[in-house]
Protein backbone atom coordinates (compact mmCIF):
# COMPACT_ATOMS: atom_id res chain seq x y z
CA UNK A 1 0.00 0.00 0.00
CA UNK A 2 1.13 3.51 -0.84
CA UNK A 3 0.39 6.44 1.45
CA UNK A 4 -1.29 9.31 -0.41
CA UNK A 5 -2.70 12.74 0.27
CA UNK A 6 -5.57 14.53 -1.39
CA UNK A 7 -3.82 16.88 -3.79
CA UNK A 8 -6.85 18.62 -5.23
CA UNK A 9 -10.54 18.39 -5.95
CA UNK A 10 -11.76 19.58 -9.34
CA UNK A 11 -15.42 20.52 -8.91
CA UNK A 12 -17.70 20.16 -11.91
CA UNK A 13 -21.22 21.39 -12.46
CA UNK A 14 -24.22 19.61 -13.89
CA UNK A 15 -23.84 16.13 -15.32
CA UNK A 16 -20.05 16.28 -15.52
CA UNK A 17 -18.04 14.28 -12.98
CA UNK A 18 -15.83 15.96 -10.42
CA UNK A 19 -12.29 14.67 -9.87
CA UNK A 20 -10.41 13.83 -6.70
CA UNK A 21 -6.66 13.71 -7.23
CA UNK A 22 -4.65 11.64 -4.75
CA UNK A 23 -0.89 12.16 -4.75
CA UNK A 24 1.74 9.74 -3.51
CA UNK A 25 3.57 10.99 -0.43
CA UNK A 26 7.22 11.80 -0.87
CA UNK A 27 9.56 9.34 0.82
CA UNK A 28 13.33 9.19 1.14
CA UNK A 29 13.28 6.64 -1.69
CA UNK A 30 11.30 8.93 -4.01
CA UNK A 31 13.55 12.00 -3.85
CA UNK A 32 14.65 11.69 -7.48
CA UNK A 33 11.70 9.81 -8.94
CA UNK A 34 8.50 11.56 -9.97
CA UNK A 35 5.62 10.87 -7.62
CA UNK A 36 2.44 9.24 -8.83
CA UNK A 37 -1.08 10.61 -8.75
CA UNK A 38 -4.44 8.88 -9.02
CA UNK A 39 -7.56 10.64 -10.31
CA UNK A 40 -10.93 9.33 -9.18
CA UNK A 41 -14.18 10.55 -10.71
CA UNK A 42 -17.04 11.32 -8.37
CA UNK A 43 -20.28 13.25 -8.27
CA UNK A 44 -20.50 16.93 -7.42
CA UNK A 45 -22.30 16.30 -4.10
CA UNK A 46 -19.62 13.82 -3.02
CA UNK A 47 -16.86 16.24 -4.02
CA UNK A 48 -18.57 19.02 -2.07
CA UNK A 49 -18.85 16.80 1.04
CA UNK A 50 -15.15 15.99 0.78
CA UNK A 51 -14.27 19.65 0.33
CA UNK A 52 -16.35 20.59 3.39
CA UNK A 53 -14.44 18.05 5.45
CA UNK A 54 -11.08 19.35 4.26
CA UNK A 55 -12.07 22.95 4.95
CA UNK A 56 -13.53 22.03 8.34
CA UNK A 57 -16.71 23.90 7.48
CA UNK A 58 -19.65 23.35 9.77
CA UNK A 59 -22.87 23.20 7.72
CA UNK A 60 -24.93 23.83 10.86
CA UNK A 61 -26.50 20.38 10.89
CA UNK A 62 -24.45 17.23 10.35
CA UNK A 63 -24.39 15.82 6.84
CA UNK A 64 -24.19 12.04 6.40
CA UNK A 65 -20.40 11.91 6.74
CA UNK A 66 -20.44 14.01 9.91
CA UNK A 67 -23.22 11.86 11.37
CA UNK A 68 -21.31 8.65 10.62
CA UNK A 69 -18.10 9.97 12.17
CA UNK A 70 -20.06 11.10 15.25
CA UNK A 71 -21.69 7.65 15.54
CA UNK A 72 -18.32 5.90 15.24
CA UNK A 73 -16.93 8.06 18.05
CA UNK A 74 -20.01 7.52 20.25
CA UNK A 75 -19.63 3.76 19.86
CA UNK A 76 -16.05 3.97 21.09
CA UNK A 77 -14.46 2.74 17.88
CA UNK A 78 -12.01 4.53 15.61
CA UNK A 79 -11.49 5.01 11.89
CA UNK A 80 -7.87 3.87 11.63
CA UNK A 81 -7.27 4.40 7.91
CA UNK A 82 -8.81 4.34 4.46
CA UNK A 83 -7.64 2.05 1.67
CA UNK A 84 -8.39 2.28 -2.04
CA UNK A 85 -8.28 -1.48 -2.31
CA UNK A 86 -9.04 -2.53 -5.87
CA UNK A 87 -10.53 -1.46 -9.16
CA UNK A 88 -12.76 -2.92 -11.81
CA UNK A 89 -12.16 -0.39 -14.55
CA UNK A 90 -13.41 2.29 -14.34
CA UNK A 91 -14.76 1.74 -10.81
CA UNK A 92 -12.56 2.05 -7.72
CA UNK A 93 -13.39 0.30 -4.44
CA UNK A 94 -12.39 1.34 -0.93
CA UNK A 95 -12.40 0.05 2.61
CA UNK A 96 -12.71 2.07 5.78
CA UNK A 97 -10.62 0.27 8.38
CA UNK A 98 -12.30 0.56 11.77
CA UNK A 99 -10.52 -0.33 14.99
CA UNK A 100 -12.88 -1.75 17.62
CA UNK A 101 -12.57 -1.38 21.39
CA UNK A 102 -10.43 -4.54 21.56
CA UNK A 103 -8.00 -3.30 18.92
CA UNK A 104 -9.32 -5.61 16.19
CA UNK A 105 -9.49 -4.19 12.66
CA UNK A 106 -12.66 -4.41 10.60
CA UNK A 107 -12.73 -3.53 6.88
CA UNK A 108 -15.98 -1.88 5.83
CA UNK A 109 -16.72 -1.55 2.11
CA UNK A 110 -17.24 2.04 0.97
CA UNK A 111 -17.20 4.21 -2.11
CA UNK A 112 -13.84 5.98 -2.37
CA UNK A 113 -15.48 9.41 -2.12
CA UNK A 114 -17.23 8.45 1.14
CA UNK A 115 -14.12 6.80 2.56
CA UNK A 116 -12.07 9.92 1.79
CA UNK A 117 -14.74 12.16 3.33
CA UNK A 118 -14.49 10.12 6.55
CA UNK A 119 -10.69 10.18 6.48
CA UNK A 120 -10.44 13.97 6.28
CA UNK A 121 -12.90 14.39 9.14
CA UNK A 122 -10.84 12.24 11.53
CA UNK A 123 -7.39 12.89 10.05
CA UNK A 124 -6.97 9.21 9.13
CA UNK A 125 -4.23 8.16 6.71
CA UNK A 126 -5.17 7.26 3.14
CA UNK A 127 -3.58 4.39 1.22
CA UNK A 128 -3.80 3.12 -2.36
CA UNK A 129 -2.96 -0.42 -3.40
CA UNK A 130 0.32 -0.37 -5.34
CA UNK A 131 -1.19 -2.30 -8.26
CA UNK A 132 -3.91 0.35 -8.67
CA UNK A 133 -1.33 3.14 -8.75
CA UNK A 134 0.69 1.21 -11.33
CA UNK A 135 -2.33 0.56 -13.55
CA UNK A 136 -4.34 3.78 -13.20
CA UNK A 137 -1.91 6.34 -11.80
CA UNK A 138 -0.04 9.07 -13.62
CA UNK A 139 3.21 10.82 -12.80
CA UNK A 140 2.96 13.99 -10.74
CA UNK A 141 6.00 16.22 -11.04
CA UNK A 142 6.73 18.70 -8.29
CA UNK A 143 8.56 21.88 -9.04
CA UNK A 144 10.89 23.70 -6.71
CA UNK A 145 9.92 27.12 -7.99
CA UNK A 146 9.32 29.89 -5.51
CA UNK A 147 8.06 32.32 -8.14
CA UNK A 148 4.68 33.32 -6.69
CA UNK A 149 3.62 35.15 -9.85
CA UNK A 150 4.24 32.04 -11.94
CA UNK A 151 2.38 29.91 -9.40
CA UNK A 152 -0.56 32.36 -9.37
CA UNK A 153 -0.72 32.32 -13.18
CA UNK A 154 -0.75 28.52 -13.17
CA UNK A 155 -3.44 28.40 -10.46
CA UNK A 156 -5.64 30.76 -12.49
CA UNK A 157 -5.18 28.55 -15.54
CA UNK A 158 -6.09 25.38 -13.62
CA UNK A 159 -9.29 26.98 -12.32
CA UNK A 160 -10.41 27.55 -15.92
CA UNK A 161 -10.19 23.83 -16.70
CA UNK A 162 -13.15 21.48 -16.72
CA UNK A 163 -13.26 17.68 -17.01
CA UNK A 164 -14.22 18.11 -20.69
CA UNK A 165 -10.76 19.58 -21.32
CA UNK A 166 -9.29 16.15 -20.65
Annotate each language-model stretch with its function.
Residues 1-166:
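Divalent-cation
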